[in-house]
UniProtKB/Swiss-Prot annotation:
It is a multi-pass membrane protein. The keyword Membrane applies. This is UPF0060 membrane protein NFA_36830. It comes from Nocardia farcinica (strain IFM 10152). HAMAP family: UPF0060. InterPro entries: UPF0060. It holds the Pfam family UPF0060. It comes from the Bacteria. It is found in: Cell membrane. The keyword Membrane applies. One of its GO terms (cellular component) is plasma membrane.
Length: 111
């Protein structure tokens, strides 16, 4: 259950951070306006809180592992929202990142 909770929280964090950054991008780079930027800033702020609900108490570990989730989530966002087509190197890199996430967060640790 702890691993499942952690994975759900990583997914929520990715949605908030990547979605927030995308909204800011749309507001500024695509000239959609300040409301898009404001919504992005709110989403980015929400991202900051999501990590605090991770079951692991170590900030550095949680954020380091989240970095790998961010890489995979960013590519997925690009595919689903912006019609980006990752190449094999993007996919290989994303897979390596997920292995890193698993090792950092879920490897057994002696006490």
């Amino acid at each position: 259950m702890t691993v499942l909770r952690s994975l759900v929280l990583f997914g929520l964090a990715a949605l908030a951070e990547i979605g927030g950054a995308w909204l800011v991008w749309q507001g500024w780079r695509e000239h959609r306006g300040l409301w898009w930027i404001a919504a992005g800033v709110i989403a980015l702020g929400a991202y900051g809180f999501v990590a605090t609900f991770q079951p692991d108490p170590d900030f550095g570990r949680v954020l380091a592992a989240y970095g790998g989730v961010f890489v995979v989530g960013s590519l997925a966002w690009g595919v689903l929202v912006d019609r980006f087509r990752p190449d094999r190197w993007d996919l290989l890199g994303a897979g390596i990142c997920l292995v890193g996430v698993a090792v950092i967060m879920y490897a057994p640790r002696g006490g």
